[in-house]
Design a protein with these regions (language model features):
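Short beta-strand scaffold positions
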Residues: 1, 32-33, 68, 88-91, ...
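Short, well-structured N-terminal submotif of metal-dependent ribonuclease cores
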Residues: 1-33, 45-56, 124-131
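Alpha-helix capping/helix-boundary segments
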Residues: 5-6, 37, 73, 93, ...
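A short acidic, helix-capping loop that chelates divalent metal ions and anchors anionic groups
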Residues: 8, 40-43, 77
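Acidic catalytic patch
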Residues: 12, 36, 62-83
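Short, high-confidence coil segments that cap the C-terminus of an alpha-helix
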Residues: 28-29, 86, 100-102
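Acidic, PIN/NYN-like endoribonuclease modules and their adjacent C-terminal/linker elements
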Residues: 40, 66-67, 94-131
Length: 131
């Protein structure tokens, strides 16, 4: 998962709220989380003392399978980024998912983004998932 999915689930105002929450609450789904994901969502919530938001994200991290960065993940991210024209954080998220053996990567990004060109893993957009 990426930060956009978590933010959509937390915000409750996004058009993607129900879809994002359904993904996070699916008991048959293993969520893959990482330091990259933490860095995208936690610092601002902590800095601004948004306790409920922090608790929400922490619950997701506690439920997820935590994958730490490694030189192999960084090398994979570099390869993905240059092969598919990915932004740095998108490449890291996808490399983490691949390292974890995930069957798919779900993002809150719109379907036209470069991450959806990646062939190494099925990347899906919340925008195309029916709740």
């Amino acid at each position: 998962i990426d930060a956009n999915l978590l933010i959509a689930a937390w915000s409750a105002q996004s058009a993607l709220f129900e879809r994002a929450l359904a993904i996070l609450e699916d008991p048959d789904r293993t969520l893959i989380v990482s330091d990259a994901l933490w860095l995208e969502v936690m610092p601002k919530a902590i800095y601004h003392a948004h306790a409920e938001e922090c608790a929400f994200y922490q619950a997701v991290f506690a439920r997820g399978e935590y994958i730490t960065w490694s030189s192999e993940i960084v090398a994979s991210a570099k390869h993905l980024a240059q092969s598919h024209g990915l932004a740095a954080m998108d490449a890291i998220h996808l490399a983490v998912a691949l390292a974890a053996g995930a069957s798919e990567f779900i993002s809150g990004e719109k379907p036209g983004k470069p991450m959806f060109r990646v062939k190494e893993i099925s990347a899906r957009s919340l925008w195309g998932i029916v709740p």
